[in-house]
Amino acid sequence: MTATAAKKGDAVSSYDVVVIGAGAAGLCAGALLAREGKRVVVLDRSPYPGGRAMAVPDEGFTVNLGGHLIEDGGSGLTKVFEHVGKELIHGEVSKEMPIWENGSGWGSIRDRYTDRAELKKVIKALADTPYSELDDWDDRSLREWIHQHTSDQGVVDLFEFISVLECMTDNWYDHSASDNLYVRKMHYEERNTAAYSCWPGQGWDGLWRDLADAITGHGGELRLGTTVERVIVENGAVKGVAVAREPRVLPNEFFEEEILEAPAVISTLPVWHVLNVVPRSVLPEWYASQIEFLAQDKFRIAWLGLYLATEEPVTQFDPRELSTWTATPSTDCSGFMFDQSAMDPSCSPEGTHLHVLGAIIPGAKGRDREWCRATMQAFERDVETMWPGLANPVWRRRHLVFEPSFGVIQMPGLVGKYRPHWRAPNVEGLWFASETFRSRGVGTDRAARAALTCVEDYLGARIPTFGDGWRY
């Protein structure tokens, strides 16, 4: 380590790989690397593991930073657990999809695609399409691809309502074909269904605890409450990271650092934060500009969220249903709702049902507190119309999913090859295992696959456990 990287007297520790972030991607990357015998440390500024899918207690309830389900048919996050000696328990699986239509109320998605022959035709076309051909649809919409195979609006509705439930877009009709169809194809191949989602049987906190145990059990380190100040790059190669001194007594303390030496760094930071830690100057202008373009607020997936607890359930057809809509009675917000207690009774006190709801908003409005407050008030009034049983909850928590965001919106031209590559150009030893960079999937499974892609690239070989399962 040269004088530019560390001052005399600084503490220095050495690793094979430093992983920045202890969310799904960081924990998966750390566990995989430790399992492969690498000396790895995973760092996160939060005291909780799990990133935006962390689970925290609140007055007897267990809540996340917005609603979460696992959308892995078995070849992604589940396989990571298997490889590191753990089991990802697939708990309750979501069932049914009630659709709210302003003016007519609730109905089932099944009522919309009455001609199952048309749906089967689309499923066969997708099964016959190799993943490589789906890459050609990065800049075209989902409905354009579907219309090649059917004009049945019910089939279009099925695919587009799934995109609303996955919270990957604000305008359901303007969703990237490739990103959606990658997931549909995986779910059909692995679970014989268009959209598979389940609750982790060990709970979200247990899921992250298991991955943390896998890291330390294989000789790695996990350091929570540790802020990475910068990635150290010299002469085009990674040399390590600098972390802030803890505890930080002065709130404006600056450049008091501990140096962690490593020839490789895997960052899981999203596009809107990564250039705060990776010096922009070490990246090519075109690549840094790609990151900054995607980091615009208007491309953030954002929603106004509600946790509402009641003594009686309010579901329409099945306790584990995922309800969705494209507009509420007084807003243009699409959204979702499910009874979290039906998926995991331990997340709420006995005799209560904890419902989680989200109203998707434009990312460009995420910093407009006045607009968000007014829209939240309108949404809450609409909730009482859509579910009269939610009018008088026994417990409530409002939240805004914006910082952290759920991801970069999956509009045509903002996915696949239009995102920054996961390997930093012109910098030896730097990878980006973030779902906001080039990746496929949904939520925690997308993050796990991004981690696997970067780990295998670092290792220079595919890990046999994962066979031919999809990853970049």
Question: Residue ranges of each PLM-predicted region?
Answer:
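N-terminal Rossmann-like FAD-binding beta1-loop-alpha1 element of flavoenzymes
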Residues: V17-V42
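Glycine-rich FAD pyrophosphate-binding loop
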Residues: A34-D58
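Dinucleotide-binding Rossmann-like beta1-alpha1 core, especially the glycine-rich loop
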Residues: G60-E133
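Rossmann-like flavin
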Residues: G105, I109-M186
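Helical element adjacent to the flavin cofactor pocket in flavoenzyme catalytic cores
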Residues: M186-E256
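Mid-domain catalytic core of redox enzymes
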Residues: E229-E350, Y472
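C-terminal segments that line or cap access tunnels to active or ligand-binding sites in enzymes
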Residues: L306-P404
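A glycine-rich dinucleotide-binding beta-alpha-beta segment and adjacent secondary-structure elements
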Residues: E380, T385-R440
